[in-house]
Structures are given as C-alpha cells and as structure tokens.
Regions:
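Cationic, low-complexity basic patches in intrinsically disordered or flexible, solvent-exposed regions
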Residues: 3
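AAA+ P-loop NTPase catalytic core and its hallmark functional loops
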Residues: 7-10, 14, 19-284, 288, ...
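Alpha-helix boundary/N-cap detector
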Residues: 20, 83, 281, 306, ...
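C-terminal engagement/docking regions of AAA+ P-loop ATPases
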Residues: 68-71, 75-79, 324-356
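Phosphate/oxyanion-binding loops and surfaces in catalytic or ligand/nucleic-acid-binding neighborhoods
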Residues: 148, 315-318, 336
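Short secondary-structure transition/capping segments
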Residues: 153, 310-314, 332-333
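Conserved AAA+ ATPase small/helical "lid" subdomain
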Residues: 269, 276-325
C-alpha cells in the first residue's frame, strides 16, 4: 500500500486551510497587485495647467532623476567665465560651503538666476527649484496630504469565519523644501520676495536651528532634521517692482547677502556673443547702446543684459524683414518698461539720438 499525504482537513474534496507556501504565494500575488513590492516615491508641484507635474517612480534609485525632472531646474546654458563672474561664483560657493544660505540681490536682467543655477549645479547635488509668487503658501514649500488610499482585506482563513478589514490612508506628498531638507539637495528659491512673508516663515527654523517643522503632521513625523548637505540660494530684485514684498528682517538676518549688479562691458559682450552667435562688432554695438540707455533711465526702467540678448537675437532675423532696422529693434525692446505714450516718445528719442 502506498501512503499519499493529503491536507489535514478537506471539505467536499477541497482544502479548508492554505499551506504556508500557499499563503506566501498569495501574499506575494496580493502585494504585486497592490503595487507594494517596492516603496513608491511621489513628487508633486504646482505649475501651469498644461504641464504634467505628477510623477510616480517605483525604484529608489530613480529618486534624483525624478526630482530634477519634476521641479524643472533651468539649465545654465551658455554660461561664460570672466574674472568678475568667477569672483561672484567663488563668493557664493564659499558661503554655501560654510553652511549659510545665500541671498543673491540685484536688478532684473543682471544674471542672478543663471549664476545661482550654475553654482548649484557645480555643487554636484540634485537641485530643486521654486519660483516665488503671490499665491505661494507654506504647503507649496513643504507639501501636504494630497490623496487617499483605500485598502480592503478579505480573509476566510477558517471556512465558516469571514473577516473583512477596510483601511483608509491619507498620503503625504513632499514639495521642494521638504525634499531638499530630507535628502540634502540644493534649493533655489527664485524671486522669493514675490512670496508673502508669512509663507516664508517656515524657513526661519530651517536656516537657524536646522529643523523643518511640518505643521500639518503629528508626532515624530512633524519634525525633519535638515540634512548636512542641504544648501539654499535665494534671489530677489533690489528694486521695488510691482508685486514685491519686503522680506522679514528675521529671515534676512539668517542669510548672507551678495549684491549682483550689471556686469562690466567685456563680460556683457561675451554673454551676448555666447547666447546668440553674432559677430563681436555687432555685440559691441548692441552693448554700447543698451549701456548708454541704462545710464539715462531710472533704476526700475534700466534695461539689463537680457535686453542685449533680445536685440541680438532680433538682429539675426533682420534679413527676413527688410522693413525693420536696428533702431526699431532697440525701441521695441526698451519699450517693455514703458508706462505712458509720453514715456514711449522719450525713450524713442533717446534711442534715435544714440544710434547713428
């Protein structure tokens, strides 16, 4: 007689209980179906409606790439190095290495953002990006509870006992500041003075005590110890433009301030050539005109290096538009900061007097 081992309890030919191997296989199958095999990293930000800003990455190794893709840090293309640029780079790098956040102050169009991005990339750490805005709140900086996950478990381990369990979880989604503090990323907070001061209060304890508090969380999860590799570069305009808020003194006191003025003549010429590919003599002509206009206009209306680049790019298309000349290009670019028809006429006359 041959003995065949069977399950200890069978009802109508079928096993009542699962074996240990069957239970393990069932758990693996359930976890796979629920997507629980590996931790998920989720990144979410506010941005224009036409952009897809939600990313769900399965593997831990993809975290850095996902963060940089989600927060869309601009590339510092065509960055040029001259003695004055290198000096600014060195000053920023020194204070960042010393552990202080750097506040880069300067007029619009002088190259603050390009410098901040370049220095941040040179640090060799992932970079996250925030653009200051009137509508930015504390949650936009640190994150918040964004979605609910409903999980149901049905268990009939014993044939005549049916157990059910419903669990509802609210998931927390980190935003740039939380990510930078947790993992030691470099934070660039562009035009931070456009954000209401109350929203930036969260930065006080980050910069001073090295602690990020998440007000909407509870218990141990409420506090994050700032990673030792965390760095922060904040930029703001030195002129009182529309939409600018004066930052609180307590925050300014925790940062090192570096003033970035318009670059010198040689540097501006090199920047224009590098960005547009025009000849040196044309770049010199453009920079001379813009710098002369800059000297004659009030601070809030001064054209920056960006204006030089715009005129130069316009020049590359003049052959296709024979009825437009260099003077008109200059007038159109300078007119972007015009407040009235009389102001426009004054600037037009200024350009005509400067351009032969």
């Amino acid at each position: 007689m041959q003995h065949v081992e069977t399950h200890p309890r069978r009802v109508r030919g079928e096993a009542v209980h699962m074996t240990a191997s069957e239970k393990r296989a069932s758990e693996i199958s359930h976890n796979s179906a629920m997507g629980l095999n590996e931790p998920k990293i989720q990144v979410r930000i506010k941005s224009p409606a036409n952009m897809d800003c939600s990313y769900e990455i399965i593997s831990e190794e993809s975290r850095h790439r996902a963060i940089e893709e989600a927060f869309l840090t601009p590339e510092s293309k065509h960055f040029i190095s001259t003695p004055e640029v290198v000096e600014m780079e060195s000053r920023l790098a020194l204070w960042l290495e010393a552990g202080y956040p750097v506040h880069l102050i300067g007029p619009t169009g002088c190259g603050k953002t390009s410098l901040a991005v370049h220095v941040a990339k040179e640090l060799g750490r992932p970079v996250v990006w925030i653009n200051g805005d009137e509508a930015i709140s504390t949650s936009d900086l640190i994150g918040g509870y964004s979605q609910m996950q409903n999980e149901s478990v049905r268990d009939n381990y014993i044939h005549n006992v049916f157990k059910t369990k419903d669990t509802m979880k609210i998931e927390w989604v980190d935003n740039p500041l939380s990510l930078a503090c947790k993992y030691g990323y470099t934070l660039i907070y562009n035009e931070f003075s456009r954000t209401k001061p109350a929203s930036n209060n969260i930065l006080l304890s980050v910069f001073e005590e090295g602690i990020l508090e998440l007000p909407t969380k509870f218990g141990e999860d409420r506090y994050i110890k700032v990673h030792p590799d965390f760095k922060a570069i904040l930029t703001s305009n030195s002129i009182e433009y529309a939409g600018i808020h004066r930052p609180q003194d307590a925050l300014l006191d925790r940062m090192v301030g570096i003033y970035a003025d318009y670059y010198g003549y040689e540097t501006e010429v090199r920047i224009v050539v590098e960005h547009t590919g025009i000849t040196l003599d044309k770049a010199e002509k453009i920079v001379n005109v813009v710098r002369s206009i800059r000297d004659k206009l009030p601070d809030a209306q001064k054209p920056g290096t960006r204006a030089c680049i715009m005129i130069a790019k316009g020049m590359t298309f003049l052959n296709d538009h024979q009825n437009i000349d260099f003077k008109q290009l200059c007038i159109d670019v300078i007119a972007s900061k015009t407040s009235s028809p009389a102001d426009m006429e004054e600037k037009k006359k200024l350009v005509l007097d400067l351009v032969d």
